[in-house]
């Protein structure tokens, strides 16, 4: 019996009056995941397009694959590179992940398979916990409200998993996605009604609730007992010269062979997926352009001002682009159509605000070298206000024509 036939056979149990009526949202989510919705427009449609919400969300999900697969490889590569340089660390590792990796692969940093299996052993459990726990909350709220499960959770789950450090405990992953889905989205009415990005809301909760597992030098590499600073931390402590002196070139940072979150290190891989989003017009080019212009503008201004005590003032814009979570946030987080500005002019302002804020936080805030998460959440709060003033300005301009 095929999947379609099986789903059709049990459908009556989930319909109104069936014994599993309250779980219709779960059935519908599974059915929609495998097949397109069976309902069609009966009357004349005012807008006709080849893409619906499901296809749009699946496209975004697929566009994260370059960053996802490279992130898995790089997570394993960074760990195996440390094991090759410090064999005593390899001998001290323990736990179920280490046992699983040892049974499927080795620890050779020159082996594509070894690196990928090592990284997958960290990313896939994080993604699985995110998907299962977050999916539970989605189905629960959909069942209570008696509506369908929205496909947007496919995007939220993978984005949340990709912005976490590889060493994060799985129970914290469950707490973070629960906070992001429930507090960041569902309490406001669900998809389309939230004003904060759910994935970033969950990460912000973890950052402030469990800073030891979300920041510092010991969380970015999947090796117990090892501390390795990110490129941004090195720059914050000693400028770009400190980054280069530690053997990290701009090309290393661009390709992504550096310490960092599971899916944020490779600007190249992120840009591949991001360009697809721009070409398909799922992501707004105005927001992306605004983020870039805001970041470049303030970076150049701070370069001109300079500082004898803060080396971050001298950080060039092209380094801001490839370190931290800037690229990932610009393409996948800032362009969230729900929490971003809606008007065309507002999108430029919204993007520029993010670009300016991320540089400002990175350069001026001594306690927080990364700024993309806070910059986007800050802009999310102002998005409705930005759109309000843009609309009011347009109304005044149109009224002035008739005076």
Swiss-Prot record:
Keyword set, alphabetical order: Cell inner membrane, Cell membrane, Flavoprotein, FMN, Ion transport, Membrane, NAD, Phosphoprotein, Sodium, Sodium transport, Translocase, Transmembrane, Transmembrane helix, Transport, Ubiquinone
Disulfide bond sites: none
Gene Ontology MF terms: FMN binding; oxidoreductase activity, acting on NAD(P)H, quinone or similar compound as acceptor
Entry's transmembrane regions: 56-76, 121-141, 163-183, 220-240, 265-285, 287-307, 312-332, 348-368, 371-391
Residues with FMN phosphoryl threonine modification: 230
Subcellular location: Cell inner membrane
Lipid bilayer topology: Multi-pass membrane protein
InterPro entries assigned to the protein according to its UniProt record, in alphabetical order: NqrB (IPR010966), NqrB/RnfD (IPR004338)
Enzyme class: translocase
EC number: 7.2.1.1
Swiss-Prot/TrEMBL GO biological process terms: respiratory electron transport chain; sodium ion transport; transmembrane transport
Top-level division of the source organism's lineage: Bacteria
Primary location: membrane
Catalysis: reaction(s): a ubiquinone + n Na(+)(in) + NADH + H(+) = a ubiquinol + n Na(+)(out) + NAD(+)
Gene Ontology CC annotations of this record: plasma membrane
Cofactor: FMN
HAMAP family hit by this protein: NqrB
NCBIfam families tied to this protein: nqrB, PRK05349.1
Record note on quaternary structure: Composed of six subunits; NqrA, NqrB, NqrC, NqrD, NqrE and NqrF.
Family affiliation: Belongs to the NqrB/RnfD family.
Function: NQR complex catalyzes the reduction of ubiquinone-1 to ubiquinol by two successive reactions, coupled with the transport of Na(+) ions from the cytoplasm to the periplasm. NqrA to NqrE are probably involved in the second step, the conversion of ubisemiquinone to ubiquinol.
Protein name, entry field: Na(+)-translocating NADH-quinone reductase subunit B
Species of origin: Ectopseudomonas mendocina (strain ymp) (Pseudomonas mendocina)
Phylogenetic classification of the source organism: Bacteria, Pseudomonadati, Pseudomonadota, Gammaproteobacteria, Pseudomonadales
């Amino acid at each position: 019996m095929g999947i379609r036939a099986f789903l059709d056979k049990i459908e009556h149990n989930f319909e109104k009056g069936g014994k599993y009526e309250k779980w219709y949202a779960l059935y519908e989510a599974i059915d929609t995941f495998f097949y397109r919705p069976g309902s069609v427009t009966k009357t004349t449609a005012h807008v006709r397009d080849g893409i619906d919400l499901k296809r749009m969300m699946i496209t975004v999900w697929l566009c994260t694959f370059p960053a996802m697969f490279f992130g898995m490889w790089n997570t394993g590569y960074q760990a195996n590179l440390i094991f090759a340089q410090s064999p005593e660390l390899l001998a001290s590792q323990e736990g179920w992940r280490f046992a699983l990796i040892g049974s499927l692969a080795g620890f050779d940093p020159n082996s594509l398979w070894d690196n990928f299996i090592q990284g997958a052993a960290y990313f896939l459990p994080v993604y699985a916990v995110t998907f299962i726990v977050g999916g539970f909350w989605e189905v629960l709220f959909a069942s209570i409200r008696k509506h369908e499960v929205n496909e947007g959770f496919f995007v939220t789950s993978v984005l949340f998993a990709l912005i976490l450090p590889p060493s994060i405990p799985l129970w914290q992953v469950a707490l973070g996605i629960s906070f992001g889905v429930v507090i960041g989205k569902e309490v406001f009415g669900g998809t389309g009604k939230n004003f904060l990005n759910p994935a970033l809301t969950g990460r912000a909760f973890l950052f402030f609730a469990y800073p030891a597992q979300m920041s510092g030098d010991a969380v970015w590499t999947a090796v117990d007992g090892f501390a390795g600073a990110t490129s941004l931390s090195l720059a914050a402590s000693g400028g770009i010269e400190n980054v280069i002196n530690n053997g990290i070139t701009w090309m290393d940072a661009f390709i992504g062979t550096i310490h960092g979150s599971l899916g944020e290190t490779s600007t190249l891989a992120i840009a591949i997926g991001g360009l697809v989003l721009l070409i398909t017009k799922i992501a707004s080019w105005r927001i992306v352009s605004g983020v870039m212009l805001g970041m470049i503008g303030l970076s150049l201004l701070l370069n001109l001002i300079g500082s004898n005590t803060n080396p971050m003032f001298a950080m060039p814009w092209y380094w801001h682009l490839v370190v931290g979570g800037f690229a990932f946030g610009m393409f996948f987080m800032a362009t969230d159509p729900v929490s971003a500005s809606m008007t065309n002019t507002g999108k430029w302002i919204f993007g520029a605000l993010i670009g300016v804020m991320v540089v400002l936080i990175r350069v001026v805030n001594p306690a927080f070298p990364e700024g993309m998460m806070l910059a986007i959440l800050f802009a999310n709060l102002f998005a409705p206000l930005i759109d309000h003033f843009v609309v009011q300005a347009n109304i005044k301009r149109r009224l002035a024509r008739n005076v």
